[in-house]
Amino acid sequence: LLKDTFIEMYKNKPVNKISVKEICSTAGLSRGTFYIYYENIYTLLEEIEEDLLLDLKSLVKIDTLIVYTEKDIPVFVKTIKNLIEYIKLHSTYFKALLGKNGDALFMYKIKRIIKNNLLIKFRAENRQFGDLDEYLLEYIASANIGIMIYWLETDMKISPEKLMDLVLKILFMGPFSIR
């Protein structure tokens, strides 16, 4: 209840403008209850972010992201599908955390998860890691996060299936293959 109440407020105003008193009043709880669980607003925010990041890490296991042959593609597709469904299920949280009042560090942490998994994939393929590969990793991570943020900002007006198809086409065929 505290998390949901906080997130609803966070969608509309920055964290430094939200008070414990306001959260508790809206949630119908005492401030004492809040302080049993959290030291302050920032520890509440940190717990929300860490819970989501742990879930994302478990969904994006590296073995599900490596596509060696065509037989590996269904597992990869399932991983992308699960990620999109997870984001949709927790869209209220992701909208707030990645929205205009959101925490840039949260986006950076998501990027880092993506980039680390891609780096492991590159190494598993015995790919030589050159200077420009850092830019490639940054591009892929930023593009994927950007698509998800846009999907959330537009109230998920396309279905998760269409979004998944779009992401897969861009990843496998390039952005200019989309018509």
Set out the residue ranges of the language-model regions.
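Alpha-helical structural segments
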Residues: 1-8, 26, 43-63, 78, ...
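Short, hydrophobic secondary-structure boundary micro-motifs
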Residues: 18-19, 95-97, 160
